[in-house]
Regions:
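Hydrophobic alpha-helical transmembrane segments of membrane proteins
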Residues: 1-58, 74-210
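Short helix-to-coil transition segments within interhelical loops
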Residues: 63-68
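Alpha-helix N-cap/helix-start motif at helix boundaries, enriched for small hydrophobics
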Residues: 70-72
Length: 210
């Protein structure tokens, strides 16, 4: 599996995917819907999957002495690694924003723990829709991405909006007692979704006639 993941990183990973992981710097923008930062990470993943298709990675992998589900597992590990990398890189920028004394974000979520919890949840939503759709054919990258983006955009809009309701405004502050349980929930959702996504995607890919 390590070899397959290495193949994904060396042959499939599009350079812009790694560039978009650096977009945590957007947290230094004073007024901006910060969930867009997570969208760029997903866009980077789309570019890598598109690159894999154009490089005939699916057919190359099919020629290797491995099971189809191993290919799916390697892709899932690749996606998870990129998402974790983006989250980790964004943390120093959130801390720097606080150090610089930049005020609250008037257009949505602040650069706080809740934002990272929402990022994990959005990634889980994107992964479920995108990967399950993609592995129906292992070819239609664009259609799968559009489907995932529509669902993700609705979820992101709700997340950006609900914190403006007085009853939920505490989640948009900086009270860790309120936000750490939300982060834990996001982590559980993200981690817990992977076995389901993998099994579903692998089952669909097994039925694809290459």
């Amino acid at each position: 599996m390590k070899t397959l993941l290495y193949k994904q990183l060396r042959l499939v990973c599009q350079p812009m995917t790694l560039v978009f992981c650096l977009f945590g710097v957007m947290l230094l923008i004073p007024a901006y819907p910060y969930t867009v930062m997570w969208f760029y990470v997903m866009l980077g993943l789309f570019f890598s999957f598109l690159n894999g298709r154009e490089q005939k990675n699916v057919y190359y992998s099919a020629l290797l002495p491995i099971r189809k589900r191993d290919t799916v597992k390697a892709n899932c590990l690749f996606v998870g690694l990129i998402e974790l990398l983006a989250l980790v890189i964004a943390v120093p920028f959130a801390l720097l924003r606080a150090k610089l004394g930049i005020g609250d974000n008037p257009v949505g979520l602040n650069a706080n723990v809740t934002l990272f919890a929402c990022g994990l949840m959005l990634f889980a939503v994107f992964n479920a829709v995108f990967l399950l759709s993609f592995y129906r054919t292992a070819y239609k990258v664009g259609v799968s991405f559009v489907k995932a983006c529509i669902v993700m955009a609705v979820a992101a809009f709700i997340m950006e909006a609900v914190v403006h309701f007085p009853a939920l405004s505490r989640f948009n502050g900086y009270d860790l007692a309120c936000q750490l349980p939300l982060l834990a929930a996001g982590l559980v959702i993200w981690c817990g979704s992977w076995p389901l996504i993998f099994r579903g995607a692998a089952a669909r890919y097994e039925k694809v006639d290459l």
